């Protein structure tokens, strides 16, 4: 889960772990803005302030790890 994230120069691997049925519209839009389309889909994004803010909106729907 995405907790205690702070903006940095690191790359983050973001994986959607839950579906969007029954989820608020702004959370659906946040997932689409992150580039996530389905459960199990993974994207790599930089850990800038915008991305960290989006991840703080949907921490229960995504799994975040530092990219290798």
UniProtKB/Swiss-Prot annotation:
One GO CC annotation: cytosolic large ribosomal subunit
Keyword Zinc: no
Matching SUPFAM superfamilies: Ribosomal protein L30p/L7e (SSF55129)
A molecular function (GO) term: structural constituent of ribosome
UniProtKB keywords: Ribonucleoprotein, Ribosomal protein
Gene Ontology biological-process annotations: translation
UniProt-listed PROSITE patterns: RIBOSOMAL_L30
UniProt xrefs under Pfam families: Ribosomal_L30
Leader sequence residues: none
HAMAP family given in the database record: Ribosomal_uL30_B
Self-association state and partner proteins as the record states: Part of the 50S ribosomal subunit.
PANTHER family: LARGE RIBOSOMAL SUBUNIT PROTEIN UL30M, MITOCHONDRIAL RIBOSOMAL PROTEIN L30
Family: Belongs to the universal ribosomal protein uL30 family.
Protein name according to UniProt: Large ribosomal subunit protein uL30
Provenance organism: Pseudarthrobacter chlorophenolicus (strain ATCC 700700 / DSM 12829 / CIP 107037 / JCM 12360 / KCTC 9906 / NCIMB 13794 / A6) (Arthrobacter chlorophenolicus)
Gene field: rpmD
């Amino acid at each position: 889960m995405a907790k205690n994230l702070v903006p940095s120069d690191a790359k983050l691997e973001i994986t959607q772990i839950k579906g969007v049925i029954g989820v608020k519209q702004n959370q659906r839009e946040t997932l689409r803005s992150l580039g996530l389309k389905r459960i199990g889909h993974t994207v790599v994004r930089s850990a800038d302030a915008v991305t960290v803010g989006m991840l703080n909106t949907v921490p229960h729907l995504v799994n975040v790890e530092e990219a290798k």
